[in-house]
Amino acid sequence: MRFTVKQIVWLKVLLHLAGFLPLVWLFWAGHQGYFSADPAKDIQHFTGRMALKFLLATLLVSPLARYAKQPLLIRVRRLLGLWCFAWATLHLTSYTLLELGINNLALLGSEIITRPYLTLGMISWAILLALAVTSTQAMQRKLGRRWQLLHNFVYLVAILAPIHYLWSVKIVSPQPVVYALLAAGLLTWRYKKFRQWWRAIR
């Protein structure tokens, strides 16, 4: 049985809750003192993982819609992508304000240049920003064929973001490895699309 338009609307509501409620929990956990001795790191990793989860969910939509024969499922892809950008922005903001401090914002540029994992993270965020800004139907019409080429840069984010996570942790734990493997699996699943995009930008 295929999804109806009404069911997709309810699915969007659930996905919005999945994006918003963790933010509520984050504020509540901070207020209750549930974080470790280094709450700044906890918040950075939490927001980063949320961005990765929505990134992986975004990449999953197209192949899932195709193989499950659920064409209307494509309608949730933009929503997932915007939540990915929102959490990535919170991730960047938490690093800037909690790690560097509001009085040291000028250091952000040099930090990005001198720390490779931050370089990858910033490139990923910049791509997500471009995708979010151009995600509307009006921008899709305006950009024409270039729109799809631009939005296929999500594949690059799927490569860089897990590496950023792996490099950012001092001790390699299973969690960043799992995210990297999931991203690799999704890129493999979408190998033909990924190869077409790679050839187009070379």
Swiss-Prot record:
Q: Which Pfam families match?
A: Ferric_reduct (PF01794)
Cite the NCBIfam families for this sequence: PRK05419.1-2, PRK05419.1-4
Describe the task this protein carries out. Answer: Part of the MsrPQ system that repairs oxidized periplasmic proteins containing methionine sulfoxide residues (Met-O), using respiratory chain electrons. Thus protects these proteins from oxidative-stress damage caused by reactive species of oxygen and chlorine generated by the host defense mechanisms. MsrPQ is essential for the maintenance of envelope integrity under bleach stress, rescuing a wide series of structurally unrelated periplasmic proteins from methionine oxidation.
How does the cofactor bind to this protein, according to its record? Binds 1 FMN per subunit.
What is the first-listed, main subcellular location in coarse terms?
A: membrane
What is the protein's given name? Protein-methionine-sulfoxide reductase heme-binding subunit MsrQ
InterPro entries per UniProt: Fe3_Rdtase_TM_dom (IPR013130), MsrQ-like (IPR022837)
The membrane-spanning stretches of this chain are 8-28, 82-102, 116-136, 149-169, 171-191
Taxonomic placement: Bacteria, Pseudomonadati, Pseudomonadota, Gammaproteobacteria, Enterobacterales
User: What family name appears in the similarity comment?
Assistant: Belongs to the MsrQ family.
> Which GO biological process annotations does it have?
protein repair
Under the subunit heading, UniProt states: Heterodimer of a catalytic subunit (MsrP) and a heme-binding subunit (MsrQ).
Give the subcellular location: Cell inner membrane
What's in the GO CC field?
plasma membrane
- Which coenzyme or cofactor does it need? FMN; heme b
Any one Gene Ontology molecular-function term assigned to this protein's record: metal ion binding
Keywords in UniProt for this one?
Answer: Cell inner membrane, Cell membrane, Electron transport, Flavoprotein, FMN, Heme, Iron, Membrane, Metal-binding, Transmembrane, Transmembrane helix, Transport
Tell me what topology the record assigns in the membrane.
Answer: Multi-pass membrane protein
